Structure formats: C-alpha cells, structure tokens
Amino acid sequence: MVRISGFCCAMSLAERQAALLVLADGSVFHGYACGAAGTVIGEVVFNTGMTGYQEVLTDPSYCGQIVSFTYPELGNTGVNPEDEESARPQVSGLIARNVARRHSNWRADRSLPDYLQQHNIVGIYGIDTRALTQHLRSTGAMNGGISTTILDPEELWAEVKAAPSMEGLNLVDQVTTDRPYEWQTPTSQTWEFIEGPTTESLTVVAIDFGVKRNILRRLASYGCRVIVVPADTPIEEILRHEPDGVFLSNGPGDPATVKNGISTAQALLQTGLPLFGICLGHQILGSALGAQTFKLKFGHRGLNHPCGLSQQVEITGQNHGFAIAADSLGPDVEVTHLNLNDRTVAGLRHRHLPVFSVQYHPEASPGPHDSDYLFEQFVALMRDRQPTPVA
C-alpha cells in the first residue's frame, strides 16, 4: 500500500478527528473528519470547479460517488436552501483540502460541516487534493472509501475492493421520483441569469433519471408546463399527458444499464415528438439511436470545458463519466459538438427528426451560461410542430 500524507488546516489539535481515505489500488491518504461519522464506499472522482460546491453535492448525477474538490477552500459561503439541485445531498462522500467552519454569506443558513452532518454525509479534509487529482488523472477514477471509524488501512482497503465498479451499475432507481408531479416552484429569483419568454403554453414531459432543479426552472422560464415522471414510466402514460415535447434528464451510473429508458426513447423516436436530452439523457438518446457508450478514464467534471465544432466555442459545465462512441453513430445522426479537450462527442442531433442532445449542462448551476440557447431551440421545435390555429 502507498501512504500519501495529507495537509493540516488551521484548527486546534483538540478539534480534529482522524479520518482515512483508501483507494482501490491501495493508495492511502490520512486526513481529518468533516461531517458525519462512519464509513462510505464509492467511486472517487474530482471536480475542478472553483465555485458551486452546494450544487455539486446535491446533483443526483453524483449518486454513488465520492467527490474530491480541487479548489482548496470549501464552505466559505455556507449552505442555503435555494441553491440545492435536489432535496438532499446525493454524493456518497466529500474530499477537501480545507473546509471552513465559519461562513460568510447573507443567503446562508448553516455551515457546510453542519449541513454534511445533518444529512449523514461522511467527509474528509486535510487531504493533498492536488496529489489525489494527479493520481486519479494518471490511473483513472476508481473506487475508494472514507472512514472515521475504520482507521486500519488494510481493513478499509478490503471493503473498498469488495464494492462493485461504477461500470455496469444502474443508479437511476435511487434518484428518480416515485410519482409524477407538475413542476411549480417559482422561477422569479433576483439572481436568475436569464428571463426567457413566458407565453408559450407548451407541455413538456421530463423523464427523471436524476433531474436537476435548475433544468426544470429553465424549461418553466420559457413558459413550459413541466410534468416530471419516473424513469420507468411507460410511453403510453407519457403520451397521456399530451406533451408537445419530451425531455430526457441527467442522472447517475452506467447508461447501458438503463434499459427501460433506452426502450422508452426508442418508442418516442417513432412518435415524431421533439426530444431533448442532457448528460445521461444524451447517452440514453444516443443509445436509442443505435450508438454505443464507453467509460471515460477519469471523466469530465468542472465548469470550464470548451465545446464546439467549427466556428463557435462554448464554455460548459460538465459532470459525466461515460460518453458516446463517435464511430458507433449511424448516418442519420450528426455530431453537433465535440469536447475540445479530448474530442469526445458532446452533442448530437438527428438529421430528419426533431431530436437533439448534449453531454454537458446548459442550465449551469453551477457553470457558465453560454449554452442556455439550447432550451430556446427545444421550445422552437415544439412551437413549430404545433398546428397553426384557424383564424
């Protein structure tokens, strides 16, 4: 086993509780507890964003993962209810260089450590996250474990090695809604970045594979009536809502395992309805069109990934560990965006059907707003498909 020492943050020795991080390859990181006591196992990944830790922690796409934040300071702005992307934290655990015990933000109602403890999330700080990131970048994302109760590296390592790999894992059932509902949360926030038109009167059915709240906000801000349905909803039930379009949401896990979602997307393609997919929804839509997916070495998780194809580059927020294989796309599918860091497929559309998707997150939260126009494109497809009223 390889022992990698951690750093200490500026706290008294009496306040520190020892914690341990062990990776599947035997690497050991010593640090200090932050949040709940206990042991968690998950896929260890890194996020390079400098802001938006609360949105990351509550993003359902991170279900089953232990997230290491490369930015060294975490928690300075506390936690507030408005910035949550779901009802609770979705990560398995948190890794940080330093976590602020005191926060300064007029919107915050609690500290990050208190929030983690409240929701039973195990965290570790005092870790050399730069060394950890470089290690994961070289070897690839892998399972790991954080513990405040098992401080013997060999014992924790045994638990880590027994855990299933993310590849082949279906986590959608853990994050999808258990019943249909209409999205009704107000969208008029003083800090919202764009005000879209609100007179479309279009109905969108959003298939919830782990949807973020800000996606629903953006759809609603364009005047859409948004009905959210569980991931395994049959197409007959989807069509009963008489949608003008169907949205396939983001979510966690291996897209190849979401068989119900892929078969539903295949059936939706036969209806001619406008379809829009984001992240996991993009992968599911690509799979429904005959493409194959594969696991990335360490994934794309951050707020500054450049995407484009020819004349225009968009800076995007991303969070995924799988991608569509470009050479598996059929002649009827056109690649619209590439991730310009590694040339993986970042967007596609059907040449003859009103169907498109992107691998990244145009809704931001957190992230740049370069790609918000995609919601407008989806609305335009639905509007153009509607019959013209008789005068």
Swiss-Prot record:
SMART domains, sorted: CPSase_sm_chain
Stored InterPro entries: Anth_synth/Amidotransfase, CarbamoylP_synth_ssu, CarbamoylP_synth_ssu_N, CarbP_synth_ssu_N_sf, Class_I_gatase-like, CPSase_GATase1, GATASE
Protein known as: Carbamoyl phosphate synthase small chain
Active-site residues from the entry: 279 (nucleophile), 361, 363
Alphabetized GO MF terms: ATP binding; carbamoyl-phosphate synthase (glutamine-hydrolyzing) activity; glutaminase activity
PROSITE patterns per the UniProt record, alphabetical: GATASE_TYPE_1 (PS51273)
Pathway per the UniProt entry: Amino-acid biosynthesis; L-arginine biosynthesis; carbamoyl phosphate from bicarbonate: step 1/1; Pyrimidine metabolism; UMP biosynthesis via de novo pathway; (S)-dihydroorotate from bicarbonate: step 1/3
Enzyme class: ligase
Entry keyword annotation includes Ribonucleoprotein: no
Region entry CPSase, spans: 1-199
